[in-house]
Design a protein with these regions (language model features):
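Active-site nucleophilic cysteine motif
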Residues: 106, 121-137, 141
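Boundary regions of SH3-family modules and the immediately adjacent low-complexity/disordered segments
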Residues: 1, 45-112
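Beta-loop motif signature
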Residues: 5-28, 71-91
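...with weaker cross-activation on analogous glycine-rich loops/strands in unrelated enzymes
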Residues: 139-203
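Generic structural signal for buried aliphatic residues
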Residues: 32, 84-85, 94, 164-167
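Aromatic- and glycine-rich peptidoglycan recognition patches
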Residues: 2-14, 93, 183-227
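Short, basic/aromatic beta-hairpin or loop at an interaction surface
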Residues: 1-13, 132-148, 183
């Protein structure tokens, strides 16, 4: 069975409880497969990136074979995605795609607060930021930073980096824990406390307000453009 997110944003949780960690958000127009349905909660798999989690049964609708909502006496086509709504608000037609993920991040998300699992201007995490900005450019990324680090092609060094390349960062154990979008000129836009622009060098992200490195550079990847 397929479902549709008809609200602006719906939390996906690690467990079937409102107190459980929010691991992701569905945005309006997102579709998904129902893996397990209980009285109050359903476990789903997102069609876009395969991400799994639990959502409240009051916050989704059944999607019929022809793309129509079939429950709650509704008969309507899925509404436009939140990304399309944002692009339209920025002056682009609803069906338009942007040219640069970095531009989307700068123009639509700069200053948005950090929220673990978030994917909207009201709150967004590092890999949520990269995913929605690349989606606006018709480039598909997986949900987590560690997953995104397996996509695209490797960039050998920061000297060879181009605007819109993905920059990944590791913890002391070598695990990928953070991602941002390279802006060029040794600058990166990323979500850390808020969506912000910081300096980037071969060591990592340098926060000039705190006078320290906050993230250590691990690798860079480039997503090929669709022909």
């Amino acid at each position: 069975m397929k479902g549709l997110c008809f609200l602006s944003a719906v939390p996906m949780r690690a467990e079937q409880s409102d107190r459980s960690e929010m691991v992701n958000q569905l945005l309006q127009g997102d579709t998904f497969e129902i893996l397990e349905q209980q009285e109050k909660w359903s476990r789903i798999r997102c069609d876009y990136d395969g991400y799994e989690g639990w959502i409240d049964n009051k916050q989704w609708r059944v999607l019929g074979d022809e793309g129509q909502v079939t429950s709650d006496n509704r008969q309507q086509k899925p509404q436009e995605t939140a990304t399309a709504s944002l692009l339209r608000a920025a002056g682009a037609p609803p069906t338009a795609t942007a040219d640069s993920p970095a531009e989307v991040a700068e123009h639509l998300y700069l200053g948005a607060p950090y929220l673990w699992g978030g994917r909207t201007v009201m709150g967004i995490d590092c890999s949520g930021l990269t995913q929605v900005c690349f989606k606006a450019c018709d480039l598909r990324l997986l949900r987590n930073a560690s997953q995104q680090a397996t996509q695209g092609i490797a960039v050998a060094s920061l000297d060879e980096a181009q605007r819109d390349d993905l920059c990944f960062f590791h913890n002391d154990q070598g695990r990928i824990i953070h991602v941002g979008i390279y802006l060029g000129d040794s600058r990166i836009i990323h979500a850390s406390g808020m969506v912000r622009i910081d300096r980037l060098d071969t060591t990592g992200i340098y926060n000039e307000e705190r006078h320290c490195y906050t993230h250590h550079l691990a690798l860079l990847r480039r997503m090929p453009r669709k022909s």
